């Protein structure tokens, strides 16, 4: 299943879980698992093995969050919103805010 409502660079708000209420920027979309990685959210510790470029140790990095636990933030009305798809006159599909009908794609 492909995530059509979230893309890299979108601003989202976490609506459930440990990080509830926080907002951040989407770094990666993992559409096969229906998950997103958000900047400075769901920090997990990973044990890094040493390699030729650097030393090993315990590294803290962002972990994935399920896409159902986040909502898109509209840039115009500054509210979390559901995302709709609208077809323009030239045939191009764009994402729109369901609350203010503003185009979310840049």
UniProtKB/Swiss-Prot annotation:
Gene Ontology cellular-component annotations: ribonucleoprotein complex; ribosome
Pfam families per the UniProt record, alphabetical: KOW, ribosomal_L24
InterPro entries with a match to the protein in the record: KOW, Rib_uL2_dom2, Ribosomal_uL24, Ribosomal_uL24_CS, Ribosomal_uL24_KOW, Translation_prot_SH3-like_sf
One of the protein's GO biological processes: translation
Keywords: Ribonucleoprotein, Ribosomal protein, RNA-binding, rRNA-binding
Gene Ontology molecular function terms on file: rRNA binding; structural constituent of ribosome
Protein family per UniProt: Belongs to the universal ribosomal protein uL24 family.
Record's function text: One of two assembly initiator proteins, it binds directly to the 5'-end of the 23S rRNA, where it nucleates assembly of the 50S subunit.
Quaternary state and interactors: Part of the 50S ribosomal subunit.
Official protein name in the record: Large ribosomal subunit protein uL24
Organism the protein comes from: Syntrophus aciditrophicus (strain SB)
């Amino acid at each position: 299943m492909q995530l059509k409502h979230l893309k890299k660079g979108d601003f989202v708000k976490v609506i459930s879980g440990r990080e509830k209420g926080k907002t951040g920027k989407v770094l990666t979309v993992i559409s096969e698992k229906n998950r997103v990685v958000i900047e400075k959210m769901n920090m997990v510790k990973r044990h890094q093995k040493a390699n030729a470029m650097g030393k090993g140790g315990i590294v803290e990095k962002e972990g994935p969050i399920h896409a159902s636990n986040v909502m898109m933030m509209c840039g115009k009305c500054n509210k979390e919103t559901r995302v709709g798809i609208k077809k323009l006159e030239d045939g191009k599909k764009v994402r729109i805010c369901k609350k203010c009908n503003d185009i979310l794609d840049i």
